[in-house]
């Protein structure tokens, strides 16, 4: 996926009210960006970080600029726009860049499923194969090259794991897919120190047949793509 038009660079002043961030451009202008991330953004929003933003041509938007990437002061590149996790995963599936998810003839998005009537991110189908249900999570929390999810307690994420276990019990294929959008991460684990219940459910889900995949994206101000499988430790 390529950014078109190219992203623009600025320096972060502050993130506030969850959805807003003030930045200063190289020519000294101060702008307010829309921040499309409701998470804690730990390590992704330190004042002084370089940010890369896109600009919408929609004149009705109150905040036409969107925060897309952070380049931390340690040099790591992080995608902070959580919408890209699903878009990049879909692109990688269609391009058959994810070997574990190759060979299906149909991809559907936002399909209702399960007793709790969740919406699965993707469902893959093919003749003579069980349906494959895929839930995507964006990973940006890093500590010493270790990637973690979640970055805050997530009851919604816990619900998704319960639903996936039900799917696997019915004989369908169930996959939790962690899209790693942080250039410094080399391995993945659930964030037991943040949400112990989620970590417990993830281990239980694996035991009950839910597949766990983690793929890392190549990230730059020019474009992004999921490329590399990472080891997962529960």
From Swiss-Prot:
It comes from the Bacteria. Keywords: DNA-binding. One of its GO terms (molecular function) is DNA binding. InterPro entries: SfsA, SfsA_C, SfsA_N. Residues 201-220 bind DNA. The keyword Transmembrane helix does not apply. Pfam families: SfsA, SfsA_N. The keyword Transcription does not apply. Disulfide bonds: none annotated. Belongs to the SfsA family. Binds to DNA non-specifically. Could be a regulatory factor involved in maltose metabolism. This is Sugar fermentation stimulation protein A.
């Amino acid at each position: 996926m390529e950014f078109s038009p190219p992203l623009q660079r600025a320096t972060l002043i502050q993130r506030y009210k969850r959805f807003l961030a003030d930045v200063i451009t190289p020519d000294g202008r101060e702008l307010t960006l829309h921040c499309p991330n409701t998470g804690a953004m730990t390590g992704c929003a330190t004042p002084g970080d370089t940010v890369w933003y896109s600009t919408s041509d929609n004149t009705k938007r109150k905040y036409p600029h969107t925060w897309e990437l952070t380049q931390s002061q340690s040099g790591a590149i992080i995608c902070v726009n959580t919408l890209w996790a699903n878009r990049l995963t879909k692109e990688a599936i269609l391009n058959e860049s994810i070997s574990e998810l190759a060979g299906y003839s149909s991809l559907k998005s936002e399909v209702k499923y399960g007793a709790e009537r969740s919406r699965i991110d993707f469902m893959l189908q093919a003749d003579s194969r069980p349906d494959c249900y895929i839930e995507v999570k964006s990973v940006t929390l890093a500590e010493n090259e270790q990637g973690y999810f979640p970055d805050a307690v997530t009851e919604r994420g816990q619900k998704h794991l319960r639903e996936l276990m039900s799917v696997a019990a019915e004989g369908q294929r169930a996959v939790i897919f962690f899209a790693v959008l942080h250039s410094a991460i080399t391995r993945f684990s659930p964030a037991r120190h943040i949400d112990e219940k989620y970590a417990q459910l993830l281990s239980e889900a694996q035991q009950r047949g839910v597949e766990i995949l983690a793929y890392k994206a190549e990230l730059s101000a020019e474009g992004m793509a999921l490329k590399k499988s990472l080891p997962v430790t529960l």
